[in-house]
Amino acid sequence: DEAAKIIDQKKLSLPSSLDDLNTTIFPAYTTAAGWLGYSDEKMKRLVEENLSKGWTHFKMKVGQDIERDIHRCKLVRELIGNKNKLMVDSNQIWSVNETIENIGKLKQFDILFYEEPTNPDDVLGFKKIKDAHPDVNLATGEMIQNKVMFKQFIEHKSLDYCQIDSCRIASINEILPVLLIASKFNTPVIPHAVGVGLCEYVQHLNLINKFIISNHDLLLSEYAESCSEHFENPAIIRDGGYVTPTNPGYSVKIKDSSLNEFDYNN
């Protein structure tokens, strides 16, 4: 009943025409400039290139060495300015106590969210981090396989941003309950999309969540150009956001030429 009420209420504010829907640009962020191992010069070049393309949200990897992390965050923050957004992802590398300590050192860079700072199954560990730093945002979800784990994270207030993975979870039938749970608790959903075909999947989920489920003001999704040239209808990015797809289907049909080229028998 609650789910039906959420959807029925949201349907009242649907776009009045397909033209309104088709002109929607869904905001995205890029990790293209922030991978570990990049030199300062390469990071600077890539950040400047992405700024020129209209990107306003940047994510970078951290976790190898905190002093290097501080240096990299300072570099990127100075390049993007104070109006653009910066996020960090440590890919589960820190313990809970290390996370608490390191967040204290990175706060100065006005981080929008800290992604997967520790073990992605540790609901209570995330809660301990939140209790230590109630003023920061934690994000996780790309390793979560089902709606029950998301329910536990959200109900315990252990995360601030819900990062569903369209392939990790068992189909859209399991994803929709997660979107509805997040909506009930007013938790933003920012899908994970680093992986072949993930951007093509999530562009549809973003619009379903925006127009039919969520009432949250924050709209954002990850983008990574992962082998998009092999898809018949790849996700299109303009001015730092997803252009609404207009072709039918889930956009993940691989080109016959690519299948033939990379087929095991060939």
Region annotations inferred by a language model:
Residues 1-86, 91-100, 104-108, 231-266:
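N-terminal capping/lid subdomain adjacent to the active-site entrance of alpha/beta enzymes
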Residues 27-33, 56-60, 84-90, 114-115, ...:
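Hydrophobic faces of well-ordered beta-strands that scaffold small-molecule active sites
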Residues 38-41, 64-80, 95-99, 118-131, ...:
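Active-site-adjacent beta->alpha loops and helix N-cap segments on the catalytic face
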